[in-house]
Amino acid sequence: MSLLSALTSISKPMNTSSKSSVSSKNASGLSMGSNSIACGSCGGGSYGYPGAGLLAIVDLNVNIDIDINLSATRSYSCGCN
């Protein structure tokens, strides 16, 4: 190995990072009330707000990234289903 290639390999270390990810969806949920008018005569429905999902990505090169996603999407389910 020449001196130039030895210096190059020292200045550019091999990329041996490995990543692991942990994901949790709908860790908690919030359900609010019922609405019998929107469902007609088949019974009440409910609005739901999905809970916050947490996504954590850990990089073994001493980098830690944490991403918290708050979903503001509202879903409605009717008692007729």
UniProtKB/Swiss-Prot annotation:
InterPro entries: HssA/B-like_chaperone, HssA/B-related. PANTHER family: HSSA/B-LIKE PROTEIN 1-RELATED-RELATED, HSSA_B-LIKE PROTEIN 1-RELATED. GO terms for biological process: sorocarp development. The lineage of its organism: Eukaryota, Amoebozoa, Evosea, Eumycetozoa, Dictyostelia. Residues 1-31 are annotated as: Disordered. Pfam families: Coiled. Residues 9-31 have a biased composition (Low complexity). This is HssA/B-like protein 3. The gene is hssl3. Belongs to the hssA/B family. Signal peptide: none annotated.
